């Protein structure tokens, strides 16, 4: 007799071979099921990345002009901004190799803050940042230019691994450099107050900006190596500005027409509701799967197809098979159609209409594994 079981001969799946194959075939669920990881095309840094820089607070117009002149001469600068644009950290290389960080804060700056931002975000200064589209939308909301962005580390991280799921600075830095950064709550309008210590928080802000620069230096050549640079520079990166402008402009909605459409739906729902009650022999909660199941398979004794732990299944597939058995079924399906229209397209949209009669959805480039753009707050793809 054989002295081993089938389990003794099981071998671990070759992740390096299966991952690219499953990605090509779009077997994303199998990638998750078997815990497959992408091949280590980008080796982790052997030495910890030094994120310390020489920092200077810029408070005067004269000093700002000096730095802006240096920024224009630099090959690129790396910057992060607070969500309300009240603070900006800019890293750049001065001379041959000296890393310098300049910090700008509205509360400390003696000059025209908007003039400074207009200069900083013009095309004269080539900028690397993280989540560029979000920053560009904020700039547009403040009447500022959105030019000169040459790299977005979040977008590059997504192209290099669309299955990672997390593309914040800390997650990307941990994945590629095996170093842990402080919680990414430093980008707060209120002078980083949640960290408790302003000096500590400002240090974290500098560290994150330096981390973005380190990611840029790693990601840019990797995009070339994987022949993703054309897709990145000709499609994905320019798309950031397009989406930012779309979010800023919004989509005009006629609230009165939407309300009228909603009223039509309510009339249809009320009419169908009464017909369903008549067929069922009395009122019940049509939206309750349990009560609906009790009516259909208990009271009306229709043939039950599926039963779950909580009761009979009343999903669309089950109901469609029951259409020949009773006229109530087609009315329930029609009721659900109008209910969906009312809840998704009337109730779901009316609360998102702004004072200017526009809906401003958020378009995301890094949410899906297939590369398509997703929409949220509200999800316009449902329409």
Write out the residue ranges for each language-model feature.
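Conserved "right-hand" nucleotidyltransferase catalytic core of DNA-directed polymerases
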Residues: 1-108, 130, 172, 194-383
């Amino acid at each position: 007799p054989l002295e081993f079981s089938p389990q003794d001969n099981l071998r671990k799946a070759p992740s390096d071979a299966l991952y690219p194959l499953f990605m090509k075939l779009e077997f994303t669920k199998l990638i998750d099921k078997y815990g497959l990881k992408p091949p280590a095309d980008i080796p982790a840094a052997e030495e910890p990345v030094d994120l310390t820089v020489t920092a200077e607070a810029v408070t005067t117009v004269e000093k700002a002009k000096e730095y802006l002149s240096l920024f224009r001469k630099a090959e690129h600068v790396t910057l992060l901004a607070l969500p309300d644009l009240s603070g900006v950290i800019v890293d750049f290389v001065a001379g041959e190799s000296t890393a310098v960080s300049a910090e700008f804060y509205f509360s400390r700056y003696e000059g025209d803050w908007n003039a400074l931002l207009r200069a900083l975000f013009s095309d004269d200064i080539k900028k690397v940042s993280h989540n560029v589209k979000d920053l560009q939308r904020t700039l547009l909301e403040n009447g500022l230019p959105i030019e000169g962005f040459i790299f977005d580390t979040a977008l590059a991280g997504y192209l290099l691994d669309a299955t990672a799921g997390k593309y914040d600075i800390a997650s990307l830095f941990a994945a590629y450099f095996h170093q842990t950064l402080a919680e990414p709550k430093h980008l707060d309008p209120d002078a980083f107050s949640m960290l408790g210590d302003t000096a500590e928080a400002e240090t974290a802000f500098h560290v994150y900006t330096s981390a973005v620069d380190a990611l840029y230096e790693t990601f840019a050549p990797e995009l070339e190596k994987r022949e993703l640079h054309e897709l990145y520079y000709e499609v994905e990166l320019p798309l950031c500005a397009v989406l930012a402008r779309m979010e800023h402009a919004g989509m005009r909605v006629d609230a009165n027409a939407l309300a009228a459409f909603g009223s039509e739906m309510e009339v249809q729902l009320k009419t169908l509701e009464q017909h369903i009650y008549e067929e069922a022999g009395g009122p019940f909660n049509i939206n309750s799967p349990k009560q609906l199941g009790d009516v259909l398979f208990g009271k009306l004794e229709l043939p039950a197809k599926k039963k779950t732990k909580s009761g009979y299944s009343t999903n669309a597939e089950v109901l469609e098979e029951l259409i020949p058995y009773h006229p109530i079924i087609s009315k329930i399906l029609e009721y659900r159609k109008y209910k969906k229209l009312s809840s998704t397209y009337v109730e779901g949209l009316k609360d998102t209409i702004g004072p200017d009669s526009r809906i401003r959805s958020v378009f995301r480039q890094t949410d899906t594994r297939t590369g398509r753009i997703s929409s949220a707050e509200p999800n316009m793809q449902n329409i």
